[in-house]
Amino acid sequence: ANMAVMECDLLFSIGTRFNDRFTGDLNEFAPHAQIVHIDVDTASISRNVVVDVPVVADAGVALEKLLEWAEKKDTAKWQEQIHRWEKENPLAMRRDRGISPQMIMEHINAQFPHSIYVTDVGQHQMWATQYLELDEQSQLITSGGLGTMGFGFPAAIGAKIANPKKSVVCITGDGGFQMNIQEMATAVTQG
């Protein structure tokens, strides 16, 4: 995905804030691209990345209109290039350097397949979104870029109440968990 962003000539961003976890170095982000940014919040557009085509609109409405006007293009060469990048640059996992985030997420996937995964705020949130392998039976619940430390554990409890037969895995850090550790007692007493 990073290679595709770096090499694309047109980038559609829908409801994205372009925060530093997404963009990296702003001076090097999508250097060849015309950027179209669709967001319902005027303040979010060109806030972090100056865009070429700002669209203030509901994403669903904007996409419906775009699809009415869009012409089908042959993207076979672009798709082939993306597949080459995936093969040439896989997410490498070094097993000779101790435990890595990829290994932890791989272990979570193996132990809890087809589960609901809930993240809190922090680096582990990035690890989960990058390294968990989700399928049609899995679900990822995250607060995104809202910075809501403490979201994970209560959200996991809510997910379990709503889906009592499904495994729910909360991926959190010490700060997020400590903000709501008392809810462990609530979960136990309320079943």
At which residue positions do the language-model features occur?
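Glycine-rich, anion-gripping cofactor-binding loops and their flanking helix/strand elements
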Residues: 1-36, 135-165, 178-182
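Electropositive phosphate-/nucleotide-binding environments in soluble metabolic enzymes
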Residues: 2, 53-60, 72-83, 95-106, ...
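Alpha-helical scaffold segments in soluble metabolic enzymes
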Residues: 3-7, 61, 65-68, 103-110, ...
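Structural motif
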Residues: 10, 116, 167-169
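Active-site diphosphate/adenylate-binding microenvironment
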Residues: 83-159, 165
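A glycine-rich helix N-cap at a beta->alpha junction
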Residues: 189-191
